[in-house]
Amino acid sequence: MVALTQIGAEFKIIATAHLKQIDRVLNGLTGSAHSLKEKSPHAITVGFAAVNYSEEWTGMEGTRSFPVKRTSARAQQESDETARRLRQVAGPAFDEFLLLTFRATNQEPFPFAWLNAAGIAADYGAALVRIADSYEKRF
């Protein structure tokens, strides 16, 4: 018996040091989509990427923490460039690609906010409808 994947998804979050990580994240996303298509050519591929627009972030690695601060202008510029590259490079590799933008610090009391909650909810809902439609047509 062979099991085939009908829907496969990959999710990446870029919280800090966006441009240092972008190539690794893009390779991970596109590689996942291509790998899934090789194994299950008719599979529906879904990509999610989340980009943090916050000026502050504390990264954690084991017991060590790494606080990062960027100016508001730098945070906006770096996040916008990251989002542009994700859409341009990773987006076409997937049947559906959803970019999520947020602000979070990873510092107590752990504030979190979507940049455009209503827009993200609408985009997510529309993607679900398109995925369901693709599923009905393919399977």
Outline where the language-model segments fall.
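Short, charged, amphipathic alpha-helix that recurs within catalytic cores of restriction-modification
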Residues: I22-K39, R85
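Generic beta-strand structural signal
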Residues: T5-I7, H34, P41-T45
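Nucleic-acid nuclease catalytic cores
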Residues: E38-M60
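C-terminal tail/extension regions appended to the core domain(s) of diverse proteins
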Residues: E55-F139
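Surface-exposed cleft-lining segments at the edges of enzyme active sites
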Residues: K12-R24
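Conserved catalytic cores of phosphodiester-cleaving nucleases, focusing on short active-site segments
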Residues: M1, T5-A15, L29
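Structural beta-sheet core signal
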Residues: G8, V46-A49, L99
